[in-house]
Amino acid sequence: MTTVLGIETSCDETGVGIARLDPDGTVTLLADEVASSVDEHVRFGGVVPEIASRAHLEALGPAMRRALAAAGLKQPDIVAATIGPGLAGALLVGVAAAKAYSAAWGVPFYAVNHLGGHLAADVYEHGPLPECVALLVSGGHTHLLHVRSLGEPIIELGSTVDDAAGEAYDKVARLLGLGYPGGKALDDLARTGDRDAIVFPRGMSGPADDRYAFSFSGLKTAVARYVESHAADPGFRTADIAAGFQEAVADVLTMKAVRAATALGVSTLLIAGGVAANSRLRELATQRCGEAGRTLRIPSPRLCTDNGAMIAAFAAQLVAAGAPPSPLDVPSDPGLPVMQGQVR
């Protein structure tokens, strides 16, 4: 049995999670502590890097103590941290702390990819991840990936050419007066609307477009133009706009993800990242995977957002695959590509 502590500080959530790796490869969640600074960013309409970094400094120590107490440990066998991608200052807080704990405890350090952590979070609820196509959707990233195993290099099939899906959600939510962060507020509003009342364009979905690339900038612009043109109409309903926008996003994401799994002959589709908590995306993915004969895996909403548990899970998978630790002088990398799971 090996215990792995994961630290996540890539954006505005301070996460400390602890996982247990058993000899048979099973990964069990022992502790998951998250402190968010989102309320401090609301008045700015987005994450302010300096505020996020200071919040991590204040929250990390208490979160560490709570996680160790919850797991019943004095120290773990391994320490891991998000090395990138993310906000430079925020990453430095978590990486510096993880290296210090690693040195003080005399345990190995693993520098892992934040995005790989999102993929790994699913193992807590559904067991070891088989070969799969993964749709990774969050506030800053939208990728379609071929994952043979979490211990091997990840193959990128496609990504967004402009806005990430989560970024589009936040911008449209702001346009509709829903505030920041907008993902959940827009999802809740969309449930009360008619998703067929307004049909918004599906970017990069034509026969000449890249089969696995995404674009949400045009959709965002279409929503803005619709609001500008119809705001004075007697029947103007923001719920219908939200529902139509959400349907356009979920339609393209699930269509391309299922298409990739079918084309590659891969039986499992994994959806991960913060946007994976969206109700319509989960519903439509379930429907389309059923029609295509694919197995769908999506973590519970609480594991879709940023947390330390996912970093612990990813590091545990690397340990199980025989990956060596990272050196303590490895630098953080705000632009780390999704294909590189570990920096060493």
From Swiss-Prot:
One of its GO terms (cellular component) is cytoplasm. It catalyses: L-threonylcarbamoyladenylate + adenosine(37) in tRNA = N(6)-L-threonylcarbamoyladenosine(37) in tRNA + AMP + H(+). Residues 325-344 are annotated as: Disordered. Its cofactor is Fe(2+). GO terms for biological process: tRNA threonylcarbamoyladenosine modification. Its EC number is 2.3.1.234. GO terms for molecular function: iron ion binding; N(6)-L-threonylcarbamoyladenine synthase activity. It comes from the Bacteria. Keywords: Acyltransferase, Cytoplasm, Iron, Metal-binding, Transferase, tRNA processing. Binds 1 Fe(2+) ion per subunit. Fe cation binds at H114, H118, D306. Substrate binds at L136, V137, S138, G139, G140, D170, G183, D187, N278. SUPFAM superfamilies: Actin-like ATPase domain. It is found in: Cytoplasm. Required for the formation of a threonylcarbamoyl group on adenosine at position 37 (t(6)A37) in tRNAs that read codons beginning with adenine. Is involved in the transfer of the threonylcarbamoyl moiety of threonylcarbamoyl-AMP (TC-AMP) to the N6 group of A37, together with TsaE and TsaB. TsaD likely plays a direct catalytic role in this reaction. Belongs to the KAE1 / TsaD family. Interacts with RimI. This is tRNA N6-adenosine threonylcarbamoyltransferase. It comes from Mycobacterium tuberculosis (strain ATCC 25618 / H37Rv).
